[in-house]
């Protein structure tokens, strides 16, 4: 809701515990990089959406847009997509592309607690790229636990988000939330353990129906403070 209240075209999001006074030049460099990727993808997507609105969309243009959606955005189209008439294909592609966009920096997994980038299949059988927190995963399921243990990358929360559509209008971000992605977490307050139900998180369930692109960024951009001892690391020294 807070993000939805902003009027900005583009918003950068970073965890408050991932701030360092060192390596500023590198951090700025990769912020610009993921921002540039977002801008580049927006220009292509906006152009294709304008093409799809035209009455004379050719078979070749549909093919080009479909390949872009699959290869650049990693959108998974229905297996029988080609069997449908052009009108269906145009409407389907338009709906898939006319969404908020986020480019998410990911670092190599070095065992930090938290979520990561995964392929997810929802209740309707649709497969998409998502950021998934460990708390959302049933680690008692051997297959799921193995997928988590083999994960190559970790989510440092380093996102850039495009909040406006191809006409320059602000998206209603609440329309792109998966309300079924709330989950139960174990917490502790003053030594008392308890369980709590969390609503869809900002970068998982609340952005579940966004266009999502993952980009590897170097570990130098990730300097979390999870415990007091983390402040002793070089990244947090004067």
Question: Where are each of the predicted segments found?
Answer:
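Short alpha-helical segments and helix-capping/turn motifs at coil-helix boundaries
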Residues: 1, 90, 143-145, 197-201
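Domain-scale recognition of functional cores that engage charged ligands
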Residues: 1-110, 119, 124-130, 135-136, ...
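Long insertion/accessory domains within large nucleic-acid-processing enzymes
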Residues: 141-142, 164
């Amino acid at each position: 809701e807070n993000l939805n209240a902003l009027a900005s075209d583009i918003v950068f999001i970073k965890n408050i515990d991932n701030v360092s006074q060192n390596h500023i030049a590198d951090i700025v460099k990769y912020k610009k990089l993921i921002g540039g990727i977002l801008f580049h993808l927006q220009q292509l997507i906006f152009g294709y959406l304008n093409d799809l609105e035209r009455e004379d969309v050719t078979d070749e243009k549909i093919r080009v847009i479909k390949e872009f959606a699959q290869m650049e955005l990693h959108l998974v189209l229905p297996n029988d997509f080609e069997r449908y008439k052009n009108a269906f294909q145009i409407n389907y592609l338009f709906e898939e592309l006319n969404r908020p966009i986020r480019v998410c920096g990911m670092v190599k997994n070095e065992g930090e607690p938290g979520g990561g980038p995964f392929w997810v299949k929802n209740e309707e059988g649709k497969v998409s790229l998502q950021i998934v927190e460990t708390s959302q995963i049933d680690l008692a399921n051997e297959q799921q636990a193995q997928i988590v243990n083999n994960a190559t990358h970790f989510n440092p929360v380093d996102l850039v988000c495009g909040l406006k559509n191809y006409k320059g209008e602000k998206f209603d971000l609440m329309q792109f939330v998966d309300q079924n992605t709330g989950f139960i977490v174990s917490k502790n307050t003053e030594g008392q353990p308890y369980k709590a139900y969390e609503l869809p998180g900002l970068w998982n369930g609340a952005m579940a129906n966004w266009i999502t692109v993952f980009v590897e960024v170097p570990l130098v951009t990730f300097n979390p403070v999870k415990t007091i001892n983390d402040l002793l690391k070089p990244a947090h020294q004067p």
